[in-house]
């Protein structure tokens, strides 16, 4: 798949490159796996304006890794390094020395993998960076996919690289407008049902969008056929990513995510399931990993107990529901039955994805300053999307329905009255109500 969009990110990265020609800069580029960090770096810097060196860090002995990286550095930068570097610190020093002579960009891909190869590398980099960065012109960008490790490396004040980065860019999945642009390029006559299917299985993550587009899987049926095919790369993806992300705590986190996906969404339910306190694990799933969202009614108190947890990543929602839950069928070689079940349940399952789509679209269109859902404690009244524009002093209340014929305007008006009864300070704001359906995508 060719490169699409990312104009804001490209502008920021190229601005940093310009600044690095005065003094070295150290940028951390992070985001979930498969979101397109490597491709973004290449698009931003591999344009011939200054030399661009990309060094991918892989899981192998440091001596072997350094030999490969030194060979690549010598090829791209035409370095004349005497001897063979056996430690990355030795190679990094040579690369910093080169930046004394000329400006260039160095991208280190999967930077967190040094934690497995040799965690001492981070201390080596810190000492060398401190020695050289004020007298060199290096645009250093480190890419990392594992939030747990990247947060530890750069934002834990006990770690050597704490405070060394001069900037941080978090790359998000494609938003609705860019996803539509990509889909239109491959299938100009796509339908909104096709778009909803693509959003549901990919969540806008570049790798999974590419997976579908490259396979010419443009309809729901074609996407499900691709996902559950014998050669599918989608099936093992969830377990692979989570094992890397969670490390030794993999079992606990995996159990929590599976339970939340199955409908056990309150702290009490999850505590009973594991037989231990889960608050710390849930907080990390939300704050560090961005896989889970703690949902509570908009305008509610942060300490409110009227809250529940949801898997907030469309890919993982789909993977836990139709891959992990049906793993017994996969073990029997019956991916055809997995596909049939996904086809049968897709309409109900994709309702939440449609709600997330419209939430993302409203935010992307800058149509609010606060957005969320609202429900009362008894669960009798629930509004899918509530938006507030604090500048215009307005509110909007939306029901999200795949089938527009199921929308009940009178019932929504009753829910809005219940909302104002619980939030009387909002009653004087101008407001509107409406339906958001598949036709509005």
Where are these regions (language model features)?
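A cross-kingdom feature that marks ATP-driven nucleic-acid transaction machinery
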Residues: 305-441
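Phosphate-binding site recognition
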Residues: 1-336, 340
